[in-house]
Design a protein with these regions (language model features):
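Core structural elements
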Residues: 1-2
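Extended repeat-based interaction scaffolds and adjacent low-complexity, acidic/S/T/P-biased segments
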Residues: 5-457
């Protein structure tokens, strides 16, 4: 059999194929176990199972020292020795000290290459989150060395291989979320330098994103890494600056072209507005981000806040962002004017956007409270009941202390300052819209009685 295959000496597969051909006389329902990888097929012949079990044994072999190998396994061994990591072990480290950071970066590079036996049991997915503690379970399974040999196709050193593997993953990413995840892994692994070709391709990939609600998390993570992640060496990295600028540009494009978000995307939609506003506010305060035009972004926000056919949520969010940027035309009066232009059903959505982005500028202004109270008084009973759920939900953006301040100002507006603030914050045993509906029914009943001459005011 070896001679037929052109082998000078019989190889292991020659011996196994010869034994199988000699012992098995019936057709096989599954391929030979040594012809594929993974779990043995359930229909494998019992003779083959016995053969594998007998020949496999309990020992672990080693490649002969003269066996040609790629340089990656040796480099990994050197990196593990340099950082004092031994396998097997259970390792607890802290990324906020130099030794722990070096160990964490080596282990994260191995995890990027999907090397068996390298499992992180505890730790944050972001470099800037948490207390920096990580717990790893390190083993040396039989498949580990083979996986290192296969991973050598990405590079000769651990750093190069992990970087090239991440580049391949980012090019295969299905959206901005996957790209952000890869860049978070790069930060954990201390990989800040990537090829210029990747930067150009990432810009094209991000320009294909079509979901505004997906941009918030990406903006938040990318901006934090670009501006603050000095520990991992990602602060000001070119890869982050390129992707961040492309993401901001795409977000601005989407916020002017998207429609009304559905219920499932409502909070993610607002999160995107908040993340965008946070970055624009920092640019307004003097942060330099080449490639992003603050004046163009402000002009877009002005257009969006005044667009009659735009969703009320976006109009409110755009005006709230302008207030955060201290735009001269964005004020409490402008917010009241916009609310007056909208239908009662849209007022709650607009208030959502306003308070989500500019609650400090609005909730504590007596002029806005007085004007908003006047706006509510002009609504009919039916319109008020329909708008009440959205209006109450919008107030949920105020934290407890700010709700107390708002309640105090509402009492002062109605000249009821002698009442405690808790009078407006007492929990109700039924929904407020139900109370308003019952009050409406009561007024209708009294009007009917008065019409019949039974009741007189």
């Amino acid at each position: 059999l070896a001679q037929l295959r052109g082998h000078t000496l019989p190889l292991r597969t020659d011996w196994l194929d010869a034994i199988a051909g000699s012992l098995i006389k019936e057709a096989l329902n599954a391929p030979l176990p040594w012809s594929y990888r993974g779990v043995i097929h359930p229909d494998t012949d019992p003779i083959l199972l016995t053969l594998i079990d007998t020949l496999a044994g309990d020992g672990f072999g080693k490649l002969a020292p003269s066996t040609p190998q790629p340089p990656l396994p040796k480099d990994v061994t050197c990196e593990l020795e340099r950082t004092a990591i031994s396998l097997p072990a259970e390792l607890t480290l802290n990324r906020f000290n130099p030794n722990g950071l070096a160990q964490s970066q080596v282990l994260h590079r191995l995890a990027i290459l999907e090397i068996p036996g390298i499992v992180r049991q505890q730790g944050s997915t972001l470099t800037l989150a948490g207390n920096g503690e990580e717990r790893w379970k390190l083993t040396r399974p039989l498949s580990q060395h083979a996986a290192l040999i296969e991973a050598a196709c990405f590079g000769a050193t651990l750093q190069e291989a992990a970087r090239n593997k991440l580049e391949a993953d980012m090019l295969d990413a299905g959206g901005i979320g996957s790209i952000t995840t890869c860049l978070s892994q790069a930060a954990l692994a201390g990989l800040a330098s990537f090829s210029q070709q990747l930067l150009e391709q990432l810009t094209l990939l991000i320009a294909q994103e079509n979901q505004f609600a997906e941009m918030g998390q990406a903006l938040e993570v990318l901006y934090a890494l670009w501006r603050l992640d000095e520990i991992s060496g990602m602060q000001g990295a070119q890869i982050l600056q390129t992707t961040l600028c492309a993401t901001i540009d795409r977000t601005l494009w989407l916020c002017e072209s998207n429609g009304r978000p559905d219920e499932k995307e409502f909070h993610a939609h607002l999160h995107s507005w908040q993340a965008l506003c946070h970055i624009l506010r920092d640019l307004h305060s003097g942060v330099n981000l080449p490639g992003v035009s603050l004046s163009a972004a402000v002009a877009l926000l002005e257009r969006r806040s005044q667009a009659i056919h735009a969703p009320a949520l976006d109009r409110g969010a755009a005006l709230g962002a302008l207030m955060r940027l201290e735009h001269p035309n964005a004020s409490a009066e402008a917010a009241l004017t916009m609310l007056a232009q909208l239908s009662p059903a849209q007022s709650g959505e607009a208030l959502h956007g306003l308070l989500a982005l500019a609650r400090h500028q609005l909730a504590c202004q007596p002029a806005f409270i007085a004007g908003f109270s006047s706006h509510l008084n002009q609504l009919s009973e039916a319109d008020f009941i329909n708008a009440l759920p959205d209006l109450r939900a919008a107030m949920a953006w105020l934290p407890p202390r700010e709700r107390g301040t708002l309640a105090h100002q509402v009492l002062e507006h109605y000249q009821l300052a002698q009442l405690p603030v808790s009078a407006l914050q007492m929990p109700l045993h039924c929904p407020p819209q139900a109370i308003a509906h019952h009050q409406q029914l009561e007024q209708q009943a009294l009007a009917s009685l008065q019409n019949w001459g039974v009741f007189h005011v």
